[in-house]
Amino acid sequence: MRHHYTGKVRDLYEVSIDRMLMVASDRISVFDVVLPDEIPDKGRVLTGLSAFWFDQTAHLWPNHVVSADPTDLPETAGPEIAGRAMLVRTTRPVRLECIARGYLFGSAWSEYSEQGTVCGRPLPAGLRQAEQLPEPIFTSTTKAESGHDETVTDAEAAALVGDDVFEQVREATLRIYNFAAAHAAAQGVLLADTKLEFGVVDDELLVIDEMLTPDSSRYWPAEHYAVGGSPPSFDKQFVRDHYLTLGWDQTPPAPAVPQAVIDGTRARYVEAYELITGKSFDEWFGPDS
């Protein structure tokens, strides 16, 4: 296998002309900066939860997964990547990050509280932080090779990737979000928002990268949800909140991650996996599989 690319969290290896091995590390990033410390088992959680959601949503939109079973991985792949690796189809990435928002939070809340809009789109007056939106909305950002992604309007996104591709990614993102939000709610979890990525192969648009993980989504425990603040979460908002207290300017290098934040993040990720899949994380593939 030949190393192809290293991202903030994942490493890609070329297996053949049309197959890649995608390996999720335990690295974690906030504000587009990779932190100096890792979260144990994080890569396995991301892969396990992605595998679950890719399987559950395949009837809604096709995806790039070939297999996450260690027995299907290339013989040159070592046992240490079991549970954190997927064999996937090679695609040409669409240069957008596609976001479905069901609740008013994060950067969407920041813009709304100042301007009454989200990505330039007017929303009803009087909404509060973390409030459920009248209906889920689609927003997008550019996919930057380095540095910060930039929010774009629907018109700018369509100009960037073409009208047809834009309409497809918008439809797929909202379709998947609505399905996943309903499933999560039945498990006592609110899916506040999520980010999806897409790629094209043989003129077919596929969902790629990860799906509905605590890295790419905001998950809130329904029993503790309240409008007007920052709900407890099963995602990396816990890490973001810590770094927001430090006065850090969000440029590398980032300060070290305290052990309490490392342990708390791992616990939240594992809990998200178990609540959503209904399975013990101990059952997911690991180095001893």
Question: Where is each model-derived feature located?
Answer:
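Active-site loop/lid in soluble adenylation, ligation, and acyl-transfer enzymes
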Residues: 1-143, 250-256, 260-289
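Catalytic cores of nucleic-acid ligases and guanylyltransferases
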Residues: 25, 47, 81, 179, ...
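Generic recognition of stable, solvent-exposed alpha-helical segments in well-folded globular domains
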Residues: 44, 48, 164, 168-171, ...
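Conserved metal-phosphate-binding beta-hairpin within the catalytic cores
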Residues: 100, 191-211
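A short mid-domain helix/strand-loop element embedded in enzyme catalytic domains
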Residues: 132-163
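A long amphipathic alpha-helix within ATP-dependent nucleotide-binding catalytic cores
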Residues: 161-192
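C-terminal helix-cap and adjacent tail motif
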Residues: 211-272, 276
